[in-house]
């Protein structure tokens, strides 16, 4: 397939994100493939797959907010913060009232805070991924990251399990959030299920399973950027844009995509001053 754009897949449990996109690459005979945000093997849900020139749009989808459905199991901790890991601590269950759970959830609802990523993650330190250090039992300093829990709501609390829906900023680790929530409840916990239901404006009901995915599921680059709420300016003459020169356009936003009249994305531009824009990312069509 020579076309470019994105495909929204619903990742099944047990696959790595890379394994998923490689399966898609083989199935559709794609030359170049990528994704805009990894999911843990245990997790399911929305993965934005970038096809051919669509890989050049990675940053513009990575920066979007996310939404998840998550279930946490109380009184049991694992090294990976989820049920794929080894149990490292267990507590005798004790009574936690639903009112307590609701109070803690309310505390995190709308909260911006410095979150510590889990050691079992793909963050790189000195060129090496954190999970590689963890597997070698090496202790490294991990910088906390400012994240925001835009919305957190309780869906169900029973049998020592708490199910919630989370809307959060990019870079949020749900596994770490669950550990932080457990601390506020004076206990330990780990994730037993995690489902990404939204990535930016791309939602799970519009996703497709890898088994049913076809070329017709491709969303063209122009349409994908429009769906992501970026501003697109169509020009009759795109010669200056193709050469990466500054241009003058009237636009509402500071970041705009430039296309020709055939709705082919050419480049991404950012406002320099007034109506003058400079090239931020060119060659989107080549």
UniProtKB/Swiss-Prot annotation:
Catalytic activity: uridine(55) in tRNA = pseudouridine(55) in tRNA
Active site: 40
E.C. numbers: 5.4.99.25
GO MF annotation: an example: tRNA pseudouridine(55) synthase activity
GO biological process, one term: tRNA pseudouridine synthesis
Enzyme class: isomerase
Keywords for the protein's UniProt record, in alphabetical order: Isomerase, tRNA processing
Coiled-coil region(s): none
Family to which this protein belongs: Belongs to the pseudouridine synthase TruB family. Type 1 subfamily.
Free-text function comment from the UniProt entry: Responsible for synthesis of pseudouridine from uracil-55 in the psi GC loop of transfer RNAs.
PANTHER family: PSEUDOURIDYLATE SYNTHASE TRUB1, TRNA-PSEUDOURIDINE SYNTHASE
Protein name: tRNA pseudouridine synthase B
Source organism of the structure: Mesoplasma florum (strain ATCC 33453 / NBRC 100688 / NCTC 11704 / L1)
């Amino acid at each position: 397939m020579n076309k470019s754009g994105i495909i929204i897949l619903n990742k099944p449990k047990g696959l790595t994100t890379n394994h998923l996109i490689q399966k898609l690459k083989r199935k559709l005979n794609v030359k170049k493939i990528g994704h805009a945000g990894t999911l843990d093997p245990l997790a399911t849900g929305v993965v934005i797959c970038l096809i051919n020139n669509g890989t050049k749009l990675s940053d513009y989808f990575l920066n979007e907010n996310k939404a998840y459905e998550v279930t946490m199991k109380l009184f049991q901790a694992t090294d990976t913060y989820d049920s794929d890991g080894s149990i490292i601590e267990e507590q005798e269950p004790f009574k936690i009232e639903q009112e307590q759970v609701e109070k803690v959830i309310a505390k995190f609802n709308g909260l911006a805070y410095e979150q510590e990523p889990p050691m079992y993650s793909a963050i790189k330190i000195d060129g090496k991924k954190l999970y590689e250090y963890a597997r070698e039992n090496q202790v490294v300093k991990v910088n906390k990251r400012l994240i925001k829990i835009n919305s957190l709501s309780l869906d169900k609390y029973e049998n020592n399990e708490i199910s919630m829906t989370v809307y959060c900023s990019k870079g949020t680790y749900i596994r770490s959030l669950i550990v932080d929530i457990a601390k506020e409840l004076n206990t330990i916990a780990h994730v037993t299920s995690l489902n990404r239901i939204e990535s930016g404006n791309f939602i799970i009901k519009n996703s497709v399973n890898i088994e049913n995915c076809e070329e017709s599921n491709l969303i063209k680059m122009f349409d994908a950027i429009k769906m992501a709420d970026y501003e697109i300016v169509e020009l009759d003459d795109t010669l200056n844009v193709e050469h990466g020169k500054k241009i003058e356009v009237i636009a509402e936003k500071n970041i705009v995509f430039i296309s020709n009249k055939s709705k082919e994305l050419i480049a991404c531009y950012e406002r320099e001053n007034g109506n003058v824009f400079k090239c931020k990312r060119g060659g989107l069509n080549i």
